[in-house]
């Protein structure tokens, strides 16, 4: 994309995987530190307020320039040894603040470690700026130490990539990168960008120079507050239809407002930030089969907000040939390619209203009564368990969430989706890495969210997810400690696979040991000892009463609440829940 009112740029030093290019200004002989200062000034003028730095020599000019800006109170610097953790920390900062966050690495494998965070940022439309330091052109391809092909390293995962030669000004490339990261170009959603900055020696300032006297930076809490929107009631002349509103990840409060205005049942995933209000239905994924083809009141239409990612019943609903569906898409999104989904994309709420119609009182009441009966049946089954279970832990964490809540992938977010009672009003801002739904980087993401939003933050995750990013617990001496509670559901392995087809294979006996080893991945890690090693507080609970007491404590600094559970009976527990809910819902529908 050429900038408006400008001639087509010279793109010889740049790549275009994200459909946006801009040249580096020719300024031969510009010193490394001078170029770095220009890059930092443009980044900060463009709204970057947080930069995560991983140490390295080739990136030293940027590190020194950032140190100067930090001393002047212009930017918050965080230092992380592990680049993968640094990338996800920056991702969390961008999520919590809604502004671009940057991560700086040296050359070589350091850059490659950012790939998981970049991929997540791409599919989740998060403005993540990769600042990768590189060798100058004359050292590339010569076998020079820590030198590889870094330009275009992230390929189609980034909106924009620029290779900025040593000795040239990075100004225009950085400006274009900021525009691409924040979604300023038409038809491009926000997302990650790569600015590959080549530096030539000398890489350090003169020893005689010193940092300016430090200025305390004014800090403001910029995290999102849970919102409630209001829309005008649906016009009376709209036809009555058996429509449901499905709020997927990142749907936002507009989904709740639309369902309320149109008198329609709301089926909301936890990370939709729409799982509240009078129209929200409880364990909705267990209800869908009762409103299918051949039922007394089959669903006719689906209005989709956000991205549905969590359950097969929802995927089956959207795939039904007897249902018409529409997707509210006012701006470009990153999670699907145009024309690749069956929903009708609609850009404005007026067209969506015409499509959805309005729900009759009987239609909404049926869903609410069925949801209430299902929630009661589920709670009854879960309460019969003497020890803590995934659903009981998820329900407690959901009810006690304040400030910010991050839900880990795998079973954590699905347990909340199943057992989390919709609230009358939103209590916390909910986050989840649903771009690619990986388990990596969850602790680091939570740390970034907590430090960016400056609010108490809770993260719910399983033990495998926790161990995958245990290095995210490492904070250097003097680094800011977030107010972060980490709730670890520890069942000594990967429980989610027992709820998939693999659980049936395991029960068959012949492949039992293989399933446990390959998918269950059992371990005997002492999480308390791990917490001690990283200087993080730890408590161990095994009952819902113990967890409720732990969740009632204020969040000050970092703490781990480990909840021991047994995954061997998880498949049977979910079967009992499904049977109890099915019977309860059938009873409600029979009376309608």
Question: Where are each of the predicted segments found?
Answer:
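Glycine/aspartate-rich loop-and-adjacent alpha/beta segment that forms the canonical ThDP
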Residues: 3-6, 10, 14-16, 152, ...
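Phosphate/pyrophosphate-binding active-site segments
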Residues: 16-30, 306, 315-413, 533-549, ...
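A short, small-residue-rich loop immediately preceding and capping a beta-strand
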Residues: 49-53, 74-78, 96-135, 299-306, ...
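Glycine-rich, anion-gripping cofactor-binding loops and their flanking helix/strand elements
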Residues: 91, 95, 106-107, 113, ...
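Thiamine diphosphate
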Residues: 120, 131, 138-151, 415-592
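Glycine-rich, acidic loop regions that bind phosphate or pyrophosphate groups
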Residues: 121, 132-177, 268-375, 476, ...
